[in-house]
């Protein structure tokens, strides 16, 4: 049983930013490993903006644990899509194929055209991609997601895009259905 369990690389083709996550068991990296790995010039040349250790000591098929340590740089990378800026952390959900995401978001925007003036629910919101897209179109949206780091990403993205017509609630859809 070694230290490294997996590697997660999240990259934005629109901004060139890359966030790297090393999923590990509990333990320490070999002496000198982190100092060699985190030399600014090498990471910046590759577009890496953050290097994160995610600790998962559970003997399951769950990929990520709940504890993150920033080893170098930032804990989020930036994705740009359709004039919006998204702040994304290692474990929060965002569509992987940005061109298809834009098509999907535009389709959802068309479907919700008749709901202008009503409040829409983005259930299982992830990092808020759909909610933010609809808010940019003038819709009032509430995003609901169980994973708190994703909600933090969504709130930061809403704030940086100047969107006040969306809010993000942590919890399950069932907890907030009324």
Model-identified regions with their sequence ranges:
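Short aromatic/hydrophobic contact patches that present stacked aromatics
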Residues: 8, 19-21, 93
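Short, surface-exposed charged micro-motifs
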Residues: 6-10, 78
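Short amphipathic beta-strand starts and helix->beta connectors
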Residues: 2-6, 72
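Flexible glycine-/small-residue-rich
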Residues: 11, 22-24, 88-90
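C-terminal lobe
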Residues: 17-28
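Nucleotide donor/acceptor-binding cores
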Residues: 16-18, 117-118
